[in-house]
């Protein structure tokens, strides 16, 4: 599909691709569309390693994949947005908000990423919460700026996030807005 909702979006859902094949496809797409700005991968643990050594251990495979995604982003001068699964450790904690250590199969994802943003919805764990319909975007790593939390409205029927009035505040280096409490904390 070349156009989706008026946007020049190319989808490639070829299953079981190696990271080498993904990078080759990205290079080809960049050659065809020099204005290519973003590559998305859903999700990193589904990609396959290219090297025989990395194919033997999943942690090594994810490390190779995350490293190669970082390299292709630099080579092609594009942003790479990559989804990743979490392990189940956060399910065992009283505070279910995900942390960097919860990234599944590899600390290399955390190491290679410029930014790591994790989502949390309290109503998933606590159906009676006052935060029904609220999603927290937890900026756990941000090489280019501050870390923090952004709360948005979550509309499951439309699979859409939208801005909360509390987030209309000054923007910080990472490009996110902060609630009044977070603004005060970041200003300190």
Predicted regions and their residues:
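Conserved P-loop NTPase mechanochemical-coupling segment
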Residues: 1-17
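C-terminal regions of RecA-like/P-loop NTPase motor modules
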Residues: 3, 19-36, 53, 67-76, ...
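Residue-level signature of catalytic and energy-coupling elements of molecular machines
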Residues: 11, 42, 81, 114, ...
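Conserved beta-strand segments of the P-loop GTPase G domain that flank and frequently precede/overlap
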Residues: 12-13, 82-84, 119-120
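Conserved phosphate-coordination/catalytic loops
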Residues: 13-20, 60-63, 100
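A generic structural signal for short
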Residues: 14, 57-58, 94-95
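Active-site-proximal loop/turn and secondary-structure-junction residues that shape catalytic pockets
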Residues: 15-16, 45, 86-88
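Helical hairpin unit composed of two closely spaced alpha helices linked by a short loop
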Residues: 36-82
